[in-house]
Amino acid sequence: MKNKHILVSGGAGFIGSHLTRRLVSLGAKVSVIVKYKSIIDNVRLSSVWDNVTVIEADLRNVDSLRQFKKQRYDIIFHLAAYNHVGDSFLHVSEALMSNVIATANLLEFAPEYDRFIYTSSSEVYGYQESVPFQESSIPNPISPYAIGKYSGELYARMKCHQTRQPIICVRPFNTFGPYQSERAVIPELIIKSLRNIPIETTEGTQTREFNYVDNIIDGFLMLSDMEPPPEQVINIGSQQEIRICDLAKKIHELCGSKSELRIGALPNRPTEILRMFAGNTQAVQILKWQPKVSFEEGLKRSIDWFRKYVSTFYTLSSPLNQL
């Protein structure tokens, strides 16, 4: 990775910032696309801003992409997206513009590259008759967010067939770790536990899997180095499911919280997926990927980080039925 020219869209976001910091540490020459220049105040990248090139561009606007059309990159990681599943029902146009049009624009008007890695989502699977979710499963997206992600994936595949350029689609499953938004389930549970705020959840019998962010970044980097690049979509996930009620209890315990746990206080959302976790055979066999940080160790690291910065987060009111 040393001295490679890398472009990261969404590089100031949660996963993107972890990827950017890792790339810088490996000696890559990293450019980061941000929507607004003011994002340089973002603490996620404060330690590496002097080592990255910042490009201000709104990927939904073709004109803003022309400024770096003549550049060339070894790898483009496309992570910029509208990322909240529940809110995508309230902001359909924004979700689709950010996840479909922005992706199409970047693929059509991007600078030259040797490899393009598109970040899709496990949400594209939607309702499935069996678990774990395999790459061979037919996607059945059930939210505007998931529809947008799958549409972006289809466009990327089309572009790959059209140009014969290596475009890889990766479907990471739920990811957590330091610097994550308080609107995600694990940070919300941690912050409420640390503040001893009552925690209300659904019955919590639905299952998810959660992957510590460093493990996901490992998978991204393996995809960037693999020769020849895989032609098929790849799941990145641990294949370990946990019930949401057990997740809440686990975090409550690890935080030593005095919060009141109100399991079952909230209804499930109408489009609830009852079981959702990765089939990771391809990641294990093709990439030789394995999670290096266990789920519990990842939780402990995350709790330690949020404990340091808990005072900087808002008091949360969003219900834990919006996974």
What are the functions of these language-model segments?
Residues 2, 295-323:
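Amphipathic terminal alpha-helices
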Residues 19, 189, 220-224, 248-251, ...:
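Hydrophobic "lid"/C-terminal helical patch
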Residues 60, 90, 98, 136, ...:
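Residue-level signal for the nucleotide or nucleotide-sugar donor/cofactor binding architecture
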Residues 150, 166, 175-188, 195-197, ...:
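Glycine/proline-rich active-site loop of Rossmann-fold NAD(P)-dependent oxidoreductases
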Residues 213, 267-290, 297-301:
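Conserved C-terminal active-site "lid" loop/helix of NAD(P)H-dependent oxidoreductases
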Residues 216, 220, 236, 247, ...:
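Non-catalytic, hydrophobic alpha-helical segments
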